[in-house]
Amino acid sequence: MKNFRVTNRNKIVKLFLGSFQFSVVIVLLATLMTTMTSAQVNIKVGGGLGVMTPASDLGGSTMEYYNGTNYGLSGGLNIHAKAKIGLVGFNLTGEIDYSSLSNSGNSEPGQGAVDISQKILSLKIGPEFRLSMPVVPIVPYLGINLALNSFSGETTFQGVSKVPSATYSVNSATRLGIGFAAGAEVSIGPLLSLDFNLSYNLMNVSGKEWNDVNPGINQRIDSYLSLNDASDPLYNFDDDKHFVSKARSIQSVLFTVSVLFGL
């Protein structure tokens, strides 16, 4: 019980520190950018749909997920809301993304059924630097953002040899990340535009950790009950209960189309 309280206290402290760091950066960035110019700003808000494709260790197969090498997810849909504050030469952009990823397959060749689902909620803020194209109603841009990413989901094992058959919830986890974007905003009216955006997202740059939700019990299933993007501190080559040997990088490619309304 003592270890459980300490573990949860550490999780709360880490989450608070991560959220505090993110908030400080947002405030400083917003203050800096709004004081860089005294020109009148323009504001656009809207939202849209997109497609997220896993990259690095976020993708792979269900067998790789079962073996602890990556998360075994395939592509999924994204919905989002976006706001832009237009300043001289750049936009200050904020975005809320919700993406749903999943995959199904075997735990071993021809054996065991595994269904994985992952939900990712991301809060992003950063500048977009506009590239001038006179006369043409298209404004290309390059952007960078700081992101606070929240992960949750569930996994179902059926007929898997080393894990009891059941559906398991995955503990939510929060990580800080960075994204790089390129896009174009196409004007289709005085106060209406379409925003096409392609971004590459490093989603767990900061905050990787290993969380054993049942520290008093030595069982394989615990490795799947949290995000566990750090290596298992109890990893042993011959131990089938502690098999995650290295930290895992969570990255993605996201393509979105947004409808923006000028205010």
Feature names for model-found ranges:
Residues 59-69, 107-117, 162-170, 241-245:
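Extracellular loop and loop/strand-boundary signature of outer-membrane beta-barrel proteins
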Residues 19-35:
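Bacterial N-terminal signal peptides
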Residues 42-44, 89-91, 137-139, 179, ...:
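Membrane-spanning beta-strand positions in outer-membrane beta-barrel proteins
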Residues 189-263:
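Predominantly the C-terminal beta-signal and adjacent terminal strand-loop region
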Residues 45-53, 92-98, 142-148, 184, ...:
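Transmembrane beta-barrel strands of outer-membrane/channel proteins
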Residues 82-163, 171, 252-263:
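Gram-negative (and chloroplast) outer-membrane scaffold detector with strong preference
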Residues 39-86, 247-263:
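Short glycine/proline- and aromatic-enriched beta-strand/turn motifs that initiate or cap beta-hairpins
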Residues 51-61, 100-108, 148-156, 202-210:
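Gram-negative outer-membrane beta-barrel proteins
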